[in-house]
Amino acid sequence: MEERKNKHLFRVAFERYTSEILVIFIGISISFFFDEWRENRANDEIVKEHLTVLRTNLVQDTLNLAFQIDQGNKLVDSINKLTYSESDAQLIDSIDYHIDKAASYLTFTSNQMAYEEIRQTAHTGLIKNDTLKTSFLTYYTAVIPYCTEWCKIDETHTMTQLIPEMSIYFSVIADSLNIVSSQEKVKAIRMKKLRNLLLVNSGFKKVTMGALALTKRATINLLKKVDDELRK
């Protein structure tokens, strides 16, 4: 009788203990679930904020790239006028304009505010869309450096080769103390070394414009992915 009573008490205690453990376990599980849910939601908000800034940066980059490509066409057109015009009379009236364009170089500085913020805060891993993440990283670690490197090549050749050779015959920058007639400038442009430097510089500018065009396409592609993600 006593033994049966003890078994009953043990069973009751065990069931109560098991129930309490189960309640605690369920409570902890629910707590973890809501904590994870809140954390995921907070992370999604962080990513959304980053992408909103990134979108603004990409729009600015697109406009900047379009402007630089347009400028590049004008620079190459001026070099073509200087190197391929058969008549001196065609150049005399516009020689200063074309020299100024030929002595210019292409440049592009990407707005990397969002990229730097994401990189410094180590939030790249919060981007769940793998395609977007890959495009984002490729854009800033490969596409942009490739574009800026070619801009630097164009700048270096223009500043260290073309302008110094031009400066032997006339001032590239307007200088009231060193006045050279348009006829003399045209004559200098016809000289073999300067003409060859202009042609080489035109080649660098064309390749740089190709890099700018490639970057523009990549920018638009990334911008579309960002817009798609923000619409979710």
Language-model segment annotations:
Residues M1-E15, E36-K232:
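Long, hydrophobic alpha-helical segments that serve as membrane-spanning/inserting helices
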Residues T18-F33:
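Hydrophobic membrane-insertion alpha-helices, especially the h-region
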